């Protein structure tokens, strides 16, 4: 598996983890957990963009 594909898989994992935390924070009225989820999703989006750039440069 290429580095770009590995990064893409990690990015998807971070986005899923972030969405889960965000939803859990909403369900339990936990603003800190919700913020963590949004941060994790943003990290996943950034990593996804980097992975796309790596894949397009090959």
Curated annotation (Swiss-Prot):
InterPro entries in the record: CsbD, YjbJ_sf
Region (Disordered): 1-58
Basic and acidic residues bias spans: 1-22, 30-46
Pfam families on file: CsbD
Superkingdom: Bacteria
Recorded family membership: Belongs to the UPF0337 (CsbD) family.
Protein name: UPF0337 protein OB2685
């Amino acid at each position: 598996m290429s580095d770009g594909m590995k990064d893409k898989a990690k990015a998807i994992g971070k986005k899923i983890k972030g969405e889960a935390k965000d939803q859990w924070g909403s369900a339990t009225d936990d603003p800190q957990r919700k913020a963590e989820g949004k941060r994790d999703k943003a990290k996943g989006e950034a990593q996804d963009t980097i992975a796309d750039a790596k894949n397009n440069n090959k």
